[in-house]
Amino acid sequence: MLVFHDPLRQTDLPRGCVATIGNFDGMHVGHQQIVRGVVERARELGRPSAVITFHPHPLTVVAPDRVPKQILTLAQKEELLRDMGVDAMLVVPFSHEFSRWTADRFIEEFLVGALQVQEVRIGRDFCFGAGREGNLQKLTAAGERHGFGVMGIEDVKIRGMRVSSSIVRDALSKGCLRIVTLFLGRTFFVDGRVATGRRLGRKMGFPTVNVDPSNELYPEGGVFVTTCRFESFDRSFESVTNIGVRPTLYENYARTIEAHILDFDSN
């Protein structure tokens, strides 16, 4: 998969692509339905498939007091899209300047001018452009003028609930991992670096791995059955992970992620 980190300025873009547009935070089952449809349609037409997303989250610029914590890092989003067979990920830098682009300008200059899109698929409630003026209706009208197809994708519902990133965020922060797993369609994961701790667990006979997480959002606290993977090993390890205050070190109230790896004695 090709990744373009400044597609508004780059010229070697996947022209004639079948594309989708969105933030895709969490890459939940609703997002996956859209992306799979894009990949399948692109293969039918012999065209490249492309996911157009924004970084940082648009609210970081237009309403920083309302920006939500992100479920995925940009690198995690890239990994998931690559695994789904997407040909190109276009990461539009969301700046104050870009926030003033009208929906018409985005369509005319980027989708039509730069990408020459063959087809665009979006969620039915997706909005874009300054003031969120762009929507499915506007995009459909532009497609009729410029000759590209547009499809609005219905929401996915599970147990009568509309799948959304906001519900996943709420469930994740509360540690409701059954809902998180159901809505994500996969196990939630955290990336990070192993941090040097105080080694007190090792001295007491149950060494732990302290994780400095890359993720902004993860359960606020609890003990979880987990699996750990390390870049230096070609296998996974069963583990028990505590998130929150170190349970035996009450003088230190820093929030931590500590994993006790079962049957593991390496450093």
Task: Please name every model-derived segment.
Residues 2-9, 69, 90:
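Short acidic-hydrophobic, aromatic-tinged amphipathic segments that line or gate anion-handling sites
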Residues 10-73:
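N-terminal catalytic cores of NTP/NDP-binding nucleotidyl/phosphoryl-transfer enzymes
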Residues 28, 81, 120, 180, ...:
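Residue-level signal for inorganic ion chemistry
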Residues 69-77, 101-107:
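Glycine-rich, highly charged phosphate/nucleotide-binding loops
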Residues 73-90:
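A glycine-rich helix N-cap at a beta->alpha junction
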Residues 97-207:
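Classical nucleotidyltransferase
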Residues 197-267:
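Phosphate/ribose-recognition catalytic cores of enzymes acting on nucleotide-derived substrates
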